[in-house]
Curated annotation (Swiss-Prot):
Function in brief: Cell wall formation. Catalyzes the addition of glutamate to the nucleotide precursor UDP-N-acetylmuramoyl-L-alanine (UMA).
Name of protein: UDP-N-acetylmuramoylalanine--D-glutamate ligase
Residue numbers binding ATP: G132, T133, N134, G135, K136, T137, T138
E.C. numbers: 6.3.2.9
Entry annotated with the keyword Hydrolase: no
Signal peptide range: none
Record-linked PANTHER family: UDP-N-ACETYLMURAMOYLALANINE--D-GLUTAMATE LIGASE (PTHR43692:SF1)
Swiss-Prot/TrEMBL keywords: ATP-binding, Cell cycle, Cell division, Cell shape, Cell wall biogenesis/degradation, Cytoplasm, Ligase, Nucleotide-binding, Peptidoglycan synthesis
Encoding gene per record: murD
Length: 504
């Protein structure tokens, strides 16, 4: 379970850094397999400390700043995804570990090594991986549903929770190993993966987020790119130029499928067709080709004569229960991933029609007197809010603001100009958003609370508009988390409805 280095003695001395959900999962996994443990956290009393005893995990816990002393006697380092490799006390520790030849793994590497070991006994599941700045959870949940509708036993795990190692442990204990793993992966998790190679993977988009953790956008994008192994079918968003740079790689044998909001022009690619006022999910097909799935027919290194391309209509976009063009492309990505592992199309299309979406992700709360109230509290970065505005494609009163995490808000200007009636600002970094939007000519007002902003938005919204909570910011300056922020928004909308004699 711990790789070739420990082949003859699969019980290395492990240092677990960080005791969040993934750190606890790695500690449980290592303890389960007989490893000796040292567990360290910068917090003297992390919340999961009591869970170590509750789970019967024996190990030496060390609280406080990290130091190289922690490496004494250690043969393997397990690092939690919440720890930035640029942290001042972590940089020398990791550098010393590598100088000493001590492997540094994250949870995803433990998972990859475990699958490799289980494979020696004949276990060969399909593995699908999903990453991107925005849309990961929706696409992951939808992909899992599609695989289930195709008759597969599916495990959905990773950044979406539960931790992949916990899900694997449960499957082993219940002798119910799945046919398909669908994993939502963050850039943090991918940063410390070395041998992970899924059968199919997607990068939905790359926009600025977590730049303080990675040190810059290029490093962030490079971490996202680690989702692809040499033989992974690459599903890429062709509307995102930074994503498409990953189509060109030294791994020239990699199979490639793209999706986007426009009509596809290459055999096997996916997109949207606008015809007589309707939008269709479509796939480009070579009229002269066989019925094999496109990824098995074409590799991106092959050169052939231009095919005669037709567009196969899969379903109308308005048959989806999830709102917005961005969710239509999420649906295309999920469909492409499921097809890439050889699943039949018909049950997948039924699954697309079923999926109702995830909470706080462009979720329609209510329609009151012709105005839609939409909760996108999970929109914690600029890219998410841009996607929500462009995806709804209607006149919007936007509520934004909070902890900006060091982002530049300039990319909001174009969609705000195109779609917004006015913008209501809340939170610590409202002045930065105002500065980025002042030249748009759109009315901008500041509000002390989300309740106040929501009522003000309701007062100016016209029938046919949407009042959209899509903050483009984290929530911790004012709330316990994005779910708490969403609850305050919903409660205020309920009060507005009640005041107009409507129940929701």
């Amino acid at each position: 379970m711990f790789g070739e280095k420990f082949r003859d003695r699969q019980k290395p001395m492990v240092l677990v850094l960080g005791l969040g959900e993934s750190g606890l999962a790695m500690a449980r996994w290592c303890a389960r397999h007989g490893c000796r443990l040292r567990i360290a956290d910068t917090r003297e009393v992390p919340p999961n400390l009591s869970a170590l005893e509750a789970h019967g995990i024996e190990g030496n816990f060390v609280g406080g700043p990290f130091s190289e002393v922690l490496l004494e006697g250690v043969e393997l380092v397990a690092i939690s995804p919440g720890l930035s490799p640029l942290a001042a006390d972590l940089v020398p520790l990791i550098a010393t570990a590598r100088e000493r030849g001590i492997p540094v793994w994250g949870e995803l590497e433990f998972f990859a090594q475990a699958l490799k070991t289980l494979g020696e006994s004949g276990y060969a599941p399909k593995v699908i991986a999903i990453t991107g700045t925005n849309g990961k959870t929706t696409t992951t949940s939808l992909t899992g549903l599609l695989c289930e509708r195709a008759g597969k036993k599916v495990a959905v795990a990773g950044n979406i929770s539960p931790a992949a190692l916990d899900k694997l442990t449960e499957a082993i204990d219940n002798t119910a190993l799945p046919d398909v793993w669908v994993l939502e992966l963050s850039s943090f998790q991918l940063e410390t993966a070395h041998t992970f190679e899924p059968d199919a993977a997607v990068i939905l988009n790359i926009t600025q987020d977590h730049l303080d953790w990675h040190g810059g956008l290029d490093a962030y994008a490079a971490a996202k790119g680690k989702i692809f192994g040499k033989n992974t079918v690459r599903v890429l968003n062709r509307d995102d130029a930074r994503v498409m740079t990953l189509a060109s790689s030294e791994q020239s044998g990699a199979q490639l499928v793209t999706f986007g909001v426009n009509e596809p022009v290459r055999d096997g690619d996916y997109g949207l067709l606008r015809d007589n006022g309707m939008i269709w999910l479509v796939q480009a097909q070579d009229r002269d080709a066989t019925d094999e799935p496109a990824p098995t027919r074409r590799r991106k290194s092959e050169s052939t004569a231009p095919p005669d391309i037709g567009l196969k209509r899969l379903m109308p976009a308005d048959a989806l229960r999830i709102r917005g063009l961005h969710n239509a492309t999420n649906a295309l990505a999920a469909f492409a991933l499921a097809r890439a592992i050889g699943l039949p199309g018909a049950p997948l299309l039924h699954g697309l029609r079923e999926y109702r979406g995830e909470p706080h992700r462009v979720e329609l709360i209510a329609s009151i007197e012709g105005v839609d109230y939409v909760d996108d509290s999970k929109g914690t970065n600029v890219g998410a809010t841009v996607a929500a505005l462009d995806g709804l494609a209607q006149r919007v009163v936007l509520i934004a603001g909070g902890d900006g995490k060091g982002q530049a808000f300039d990319p909001l200007a174009e969609p705000v100009t195109r779609w917004c009636r006015c913008v209501m600002l809340i939170g610590r970094d409202a002045p930065q958003i105002r500065a980025a939007l002042e030249h748009t000519g759109i009315a901008i007002t500041d509000h002390a609370t989300l309740e106040e902003a929501t009522r003000a938005a309701s007062a100016v919204a016209q029938p046919g508009d949407a009042v959209l909570l899509s903050p483009a910011c984290a929530s911790f300056d004012m709330f316990k988390g994005y779910a708490h922020r969403a609850a305050v928004f919903r409660s205020t909308v309920e009060d507005i409805a009640a005041g107009r004699g409507t129940m929701i």
